[in-house]
């Protein structure tokens, strides 16, 4: 058993927190002690303790889009957060820290480095976040999920949930399927409106040639159901939230969704063709996440202005079952199913 200590620094969104939890659990099973560094007002504050991991808090928030007053106060806020993080590091003395992104990683990584603790970074997105960009200069090891975020970093993929990794391969799952094309439309919390507005119109154009399962997000169920009914397509399944996403992937022939880092990695691991609609962000992060799957012939990217019912219906109508199977196999070939083990191995190597 290891007995070594890891501090995971991650917060703000599920895209940072869930991969961190996967690596933490993997190392805890090998006897590591793990603690978490986060902020008290973001999702990690509730989520991490539910996973049996103690969490320490520092006070820090993002600087993007803040007024001049906030920017002038930033150096003092960062210094105070660094001081809090340094006190936590000195008290617990981890053998290594793992930065998975979010504002907390900045002061946390600097504090670890100033204490002589090795800093390991993992970038989940196809374009590096601001915090990871400057922490990379002091890190012992930098890893990336997709090629291109850093010029020389090792590509290790994103840790993906075990129930998704356990799905049968596309050749097993999709062979012998017939009937309407099963389309899984995943509107999440971030900008699901465009999918919710467009997919009923797609259904109207394709009729009985597709079977839709549409996750619409919180509070949108009645409105979207009414839209399907209005175009005489009420036979489709509309859910506010899908709890068992692995089962939904297993059911689907093709997925229509945003291209957040974890979604793209899950779609690849599941082995599914995709139509990706990147969230419109100024650094085009989601576009770069989806690009490797499009380049592999496993997906099509529609920027939001091009994501029209006519375009999506034409694309889906052009994919027969042999095409869908070939695309599914290409998606699975791009996946890195042992990402959790790869990240954990680098953490072990870097530990002092």
Swiss-Prot record:
<keyword id="KW-0573">Peptidoglycan synthesis</keyword>
<dbReference type="Pfam" id="PF04101">
    <property type="entry name" value="Glyco_tran_28_C"/>
</dbReference>
<feature type="binding site">
    <location>
        <position position="161"/>
    </location>
    <ligand>
        <name>UDP-N-acetyl-alpha-D-glucosamine</name>
    </ligand>
</feature>
<dbReference type="GO" id="GO:0005886">
    <property type="term" value="C:plasma membrane"/>
</dbReference>
<dbReference type="GO" id="GO:0051301">
    <property type="term" value="P:cell division"/>
</dbReference>
<keyword id="KW-0472">Membrane</keyword>
<keyword id="KW-0132">Cell division</keyword>
<keyword id="KW-0328">Glycosyltransferase</keyword>
<dbReference type="GO" id="GO:0071555">
    <property type="term" value="P:cell wall organization"/>
</dbReference>
<protein>
    <recommendedName>
        <fullName>UDP-N-acetylglucosamine--N-acetylmuramyl-(pentapeptide) pyrophosphoryl-undecaprenol N-acetylglucosamine transferase</fullName>
        <ecNumber>2.4.1.227</ecNumber>
    </recommendedName>
</protein>
<comment type="pathway">
    <text>Cell wall biogenesis; peptidoglycan biosynthesis.</text>
</comment>
<dbReference type="Pfam" id="PF03033">
    <property type="entry name" value="Glyco_transf_28"/>
</dbReference>
<keyword id="KW-0961">Cell wall biogenesis/degradation</keyword>
<keyword id="KW-0997">Cell inner membrane</keyword>
<keyword id="KW-0808">Transferase</keyword>
<dbReference type="GO" id="GO:0005975">
    <property type="term" value="P:carbohydrate metabolic process"/>
</dbReference>
<feature type="binding site">
    <location>
        <position position="286"/>
    </location>
    <ligand>
        <name>UDP-N-acetyl-alpha-D-glucosamine</name>
    </ligand>
</feature>
<feature type="binding site">
    <location>
        <position position="242"/>
    </location>
    <ligand>
        <name>UDP-N-acetyl-alpha-D-glucosamine</name>
    </ligand>
</feature>
<keyword id="KW-1003">Cell membrane</keyword>
<feature type="binding site">
    <location>
        <begin position="261"/>
        <end position="266"/>
    </location>
    <ligand>
        <name>UDP-N-acetyl-alpha-D-glucosamine</name>
    </ligand>
</feature>
<dbReference type="InterPro" id="IPR004276">
    <property type="entry name" value="GlycoTrans_28_N"/>
</dbReference>
<comment type="function">
    <text>Cell wall formation. Catalyzes the transfer of a GlcNAc subunit on undecaprenyl-pyrophosphoryl-MurNAc-pentapeptide (lipid intermediate I) to form undecaprenyl-pyrophosphoryl-MurNAc-(pentapeptide)GlcNAc (lipid intermediate II).</text>
</comment>
<feature type="binding site">
    <location>
        <begin position="13"/>
        <end position="15"/>
    </location>
    <ligand>
        <name>UDP-N-acetyl-alpha-D-glucosamine</name>
    </ligand>
</feature>
<dbReference type="GO" id="GO:0050511">
    <property type="term" value="F:undecaprenyldiphospho-muramoylpentapeptide beta-N-acetylglucosaminyltransferase activity"/>
</dbReference>
<comment type="similarity">
    <text>Belongs to the glycosyltransferase 28 family. MurG subfamily.</text>
</comment>
<dbReference type="GO" id="GO:0030259">
    <property type="term" value="P:lipid glycosylation"/>
</dbReference>
<dbReference type="InterPro" id="IPR007235">
    <property type="entry name" value="Glyco_trans_28_C"/>
</dbReference>
<feature type="binding site">
    <location>
        <position position="125"/>
    </location>
    <ligand>
        <name>UDP-N-acetyl-alpha-D-glucosamine</name>
    </ligand>
</feature>
<feature type="binding site">
    <location>
        <position position="189"/>
    </location>
    <ligand>
        <name>UDP-N-acetyl-alpha-D-glucosamine</name>
    </ligand>
</feature>
<keyword id="KW-0131">Cell cycle</keyword>
<dbReference type="GO" id="GO:0009252">
    <property type="term" value="P:peptidoglycan biosynthetic process"/>
</dbReference>
<keyword id="KW-0133">Cell shape</keyword>
<dbReference type="GO" id="GO:0051991">
    <property type="term" value="F:UDP-N-acetyl-D-glucosamine:N-acetylmuramoyl-L-alanyl-D-glutamyl-meso-2,6-diaminopimelyl-D-alanyl-D-alanine-diphosphoundecaprenol 4-beta-N-acetylglucosaminlytransferase activity"/>
</dbReference>
<dbReference type="GO" id="GO:0008360">
    <property type="term" value="P:regulation of cell shape"/>
</dbReference>
<dbReference type="InterPro" id="IPR006009">
    <property type="entry name" value="GlcNAc_MurG"/>
</dbReference>
């Amino acid at each position: 058993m290891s007995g070594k200590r890891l501090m995971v620094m991650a917060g703000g969104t599920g895209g940072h927190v869930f991969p961190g939890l996967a690596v933490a659990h993997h190392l805890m099973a090998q006897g590591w002690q793990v603690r978490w560094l986060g902020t008290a007002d973001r999702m990690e504050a509730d989520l991490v303790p539910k996973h049996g991991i103690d969490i320490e808090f520092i006070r820090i928030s993002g600087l993007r889009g803040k007024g001049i007053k906030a920017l002038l106060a930033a150096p003092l806020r960062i210094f105070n957060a660094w001081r809090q993080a340094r006190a936590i590091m000195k008290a617990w003395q981890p053998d290594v820290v793992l930065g998975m992104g979010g504002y907390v990683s900045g002061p946390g990584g600097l504090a670890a480095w100033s204490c002589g603790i090795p800093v390991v970074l993992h970038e989940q997105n196809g374009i590096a976040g601001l915090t990871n960009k400057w922490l990379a200069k002091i890190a012992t090891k930098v890893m990336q999920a997709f090629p291109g975020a850093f010029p020389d970093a090792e590509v290790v993929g994103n840790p993906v949930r075990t129930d998704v990794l356990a799905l049968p391969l596309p050749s097993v799952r999709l062979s012998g399927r017939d009937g309407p094309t099963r389309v899984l439309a995943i509107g999440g919390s971030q900008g699901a409106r465009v999918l919710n507005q467009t997919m009923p119109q797609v259904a109207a154009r394709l009729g009985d040639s597709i079977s839709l399962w549409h996750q619409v997000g919180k509070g949108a169920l009645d409105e979207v159901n009414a839209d399907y009914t209005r175009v005489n397509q009420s036979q489709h399944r509309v859910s506010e939230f899908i709890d068992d996403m692995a089962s939904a992937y297993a059911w689907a022939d093709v997925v229509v969704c945003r291209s957040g880092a974890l979604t793209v990695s899950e779609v690849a691991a599941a082995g599914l063709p995709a139509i990706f609609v990147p969230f419109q962000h100024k650094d085009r992060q989601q576009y770069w996440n989806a690009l490797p799957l499009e380049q592999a012939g496993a997906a099509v990217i529609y920027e939001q202005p091009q994501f029209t019912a006519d375009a999506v219906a034409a694309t889906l109508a052009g994919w027969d079952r042999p095409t869908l199977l070939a695309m599914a196999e290409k998606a699975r070939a791009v996946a890195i199913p042992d990402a959790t083990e790869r990240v954990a191995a680098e953490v072990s190597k870097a530990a002092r």
